[in-house]
Amino acid sequence: MLLRSLAFLCLALLPQFAHASSEPLAENVMAEVMKDLSAPYTPQEKLAGKMCLNGASVDGFQGDIIEYWANLECPYCDIKEPLAAQRDNPNLCIVVRHSPSASYGESVKKSLVYETLMQLSPNAAHQFWSDILPEKGKGVPVPYEASLQKALDSAAISTDSFVATLKNQAETVSKDIVEAQNLISTTPTYIMEGIRLPACDFTAKEIPSALALAKRIRSHKDDTIHELIEIIVKNITEDGTV
């Protein structure tokens, strides 16, 4: 019943894929950053109703909010480092956004499973993500069925409860896919202070530092934008999206 429910929801979501290619040249990256800076960024409004990695609601959150755009079949889209950053920084809220791959039909299903588990048990959701993350250098998608059952068993979640919750998460993933079409060129991509940082698989310690840099740029306190451009170009080049 779980697999049938997932397959039905995915049929409605798959036609919405449309990912743009990424240009790693510094001038193009600069143009994209300037585009981001030209628009106001209101994460409380944009992410209303969503959850931080620790299960807290974005609604009413008083600290800094970061978007973490990921594809659960991307070997560089680790959940452990963002989760560690969330735990170590109580004034930080990291929100997962989904940009599934169009190359594999299971990608959307994994996003749906993760969002459903987040509603029922964030710990089970993060364990599921870790279990299905492909090995770096291989990138071969990992089947999710056994990991899903393991997550359900570990959190004592009934099949009926999972299926009932699953039906409400299709809209969440669908909205992410639509937004990603003209916004996200590669994964992982962080959005900090409204600035996209593509192909940046930051460590837990690097995330607050990158946020501080983005905040300085957004507030025009100093001329650090070229430092940010160098970070983005370096990561895009190493990611192989050139």
Question: Which stretches of residues belong to each language-model region?
Answer:
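N-terminal targeting signals for export/organelle localization
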Residues: 1-49, 223-242
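Extracellular/periplasmic catalytic domains that process cell-envelope and extracellular macromolecules
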Residues: 59-61, 87-89, 106, 182-185
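Secreted/extracellular small peptides and ectodomain modules produced from precursors
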Residues: 8, 50, 72-75, 91, ...
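A generic local structural motif
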Residues: 52-55, 82, 176-178
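Structural alpha/beta surface segment adjacent to cysteine/selenocysteine redox centers
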Residues: 67, 72-153, 226-235
